[in-house]
Amino acid sequence: MRKLAYLAIACTTVITACGAEAPQPSPQPTAEPPLAATAPPRPNLPNWKEEMPLPFPFPEGAFAPVDAFVQAQQLGRGVNFGNMLEAPKEGEWGLVVREEYFPLVRQAGFDTVRVPIRWSAHALRQPPYTIAPEFFQRIDWVIENALQNDLNVVINMHHYEELFKDLEGERERFLVLWDQIATRYRNLPPEVLFEPLNEPHGALDNESWEELFKQVLAVIRRTNPHRNVIFTGADMGTLNGLLQAKRPNDDPHLLATFHYYLPFAFTHQGAEWVEGSSAWLGTSWRGNGTQRANVDYDMDRAVRWGKQNNMPVWMGEFGAYSKADLDSRVAWTNYVARAAEARGLTWAYWEFGSGFGVYDPISLQWNEPILNVLIQKQEATGR
């Protein structure tokens, strides 16, 4: 399995560092040709100090790059570890990441975990904007557990609310945070993907977000020249936001993503954080002809955008809040997932164990009706 190969490489590195004799390294993978487009120059950023080594080191250049279209398919069926590390403080929203969650989601049949992270709450507010070592260690642990359980892992930056309100005041800090993240994880296997920002909005319109994405991509590429990075549109990362965007440059290691919560009055009925959503309570989704046609139309538009921009497209979030009736949630989830898959789109469900959850962390039981339309049992047991 992939995880065993990675652990073997990591163990070899540790043994060598301790002075023991290690096997001769395998031939290094052939480097890819230079990127088709010249990346913009890396901004002058405040110096920060990398204070601690990774607990699971990998040698530089140990892994061959993965084609973006290939990796988009490898993401398969994923789940978001939402309401955990993107809370102001882990546990504040009722959930923490637990070790048993990783084998649990893998054994259920998921291929990927997307990990929303509020990095901005765990770093200095002033230069050099250093990320707290103990928080980095927590993310190290998450990544290590994902890889050990043969899961792809998408690391993002979530709920950077200050950036959405004050782009110029937060631009430098945003770039320095990603400089630290990218540098720390530069030698990890390609199954670790970077998603620079979740749901750009507010001060980030299409034009300003495209400019900022190019800047952060240049920062990442200094240490991760071939890691796949995930691009999204503005307008909260919606499909409409993606459709209004264009491929940022000719970098071959880019995937595109969008989030799908339509019809919004159905998926967010009764959501406490959405003003007026209580008026939508009782909205159902039974999959009539018009409802199915709307989903098909949207998925066709996502695929068309990908072809026009020569980028693989990944649906990074979709789900319906638990205030909707279960039959409607099951019908909607099933149809959206199957419509995406029929067009070659992979996805990650929002989310694991909270208000949209496919798992109940209190009863320690899966929400079987939702799980069974996300991943059929015969597929899960055959893995």
Annotate each predicted stretch with a short phrase:
Residues 175-291, 296-320, 342-343:
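Active-site region of glycoside hydrolase catalytic domains
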Residues 56, 325-383:
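Aromatic-rich peripheral "rim/lid" segments of glycoside hydrolase catalytic domains that contact
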Residues 15-17:
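C-terminal motif of bacterial Sec signal peptides marking the signal peptidase cleavage site
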Residues 29, 35-114, 129-130, 305, ...:
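N-terminal carbohydrate-binding accessory modules
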Residues 81-97, 121-131, 265-294:
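Acidic/histidine-rich helix-loop elements
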Residues 19-21:
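Bacterial signal peptide processing site
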Residues 59, 95, 102-111, 130-159, ...:
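An active-site-proximal structural segment forming one wall of the substrate-binding cleft
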